[in-house]
Amino acid sequence: MELPGGGWELVKAGESATSVHRRGAVFAKTCGPDGVAELLAERDRAEWLASTSVPGARVLDWIESAEGAALLTSAVPGVTAGDLPWSEKLVASLARAVRAVHELPVESCPFERRLVDVVAQAEDVVRRGAVNPDFLTDDARLVAPEELLARVRAALPAVQAAQELVVCHGDACLPNFLFDPDTLEWTGTIDVGRLGVADRYSDLALVKAQLEDEWSVDAAAFFAAYGVVEPDAERLAFHLLLDALTWG
């Protein structure tokens, strides 16, 4: 998808056949024809989130053609958590940010990420042989994707019975939360294409994994600041595995 005008700088190639460019205070996420529906979903969620108390990117324009689509959004001030060094203050700020998203009124959110739909997405990825091993844990890489999916299916009834529905980010990784590098106050949230009502543990599992993988720290301080006294280890493991099977 060709962007209008000049001066666009490539920032990154995304996980879902998208590319991100920047020109000044404007970001443009582009995709080919096959990615239009997914990018449109992100646009709609970003527009909804902008109507809430959660800070994030504002949708500036939407361009669609036979070549694909482009979503133009405002830059969010601050630095991603992934680009900042670990500190107790930053972990506490991250917990407050995730909690703020989760405290948005469920009844006002028009988007859902029902477990059965996410499992169906994982089934499609496994069926196509498209599981990305980069998203799997070291132990999971040693197991056939079909067996991993079978484990998800077996655990699904118990997780469904225990789920706590909140507005979830859907991809609650460190690069998607930005903070003031001096005060470490939360400045905004980006990449909300998977936002929707879901079990809060679908976000908590990703945050826990990121803290351990990127900062090599225990997630206990995060859970304490978030307000979970005894995290459910089985639900954390379930959602981490399920998420890994949906990227492909």
Model-inferred region functions:
Residues 63, 81-147, 151, 157, ...:
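A cross-family kinase active-site recognition segment
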Residues 234-248:
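Short, basic/aromatic-enriched C-terminal tail that caps enzymatic domains
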Residues 40-43, 92-96, 150-153, 205, ...:
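Generic alpha-helical structural signal
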Residues 5, 54, 162-163:
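Short coil/loop residues immediately preceding or within conserved phosphate-binding loops
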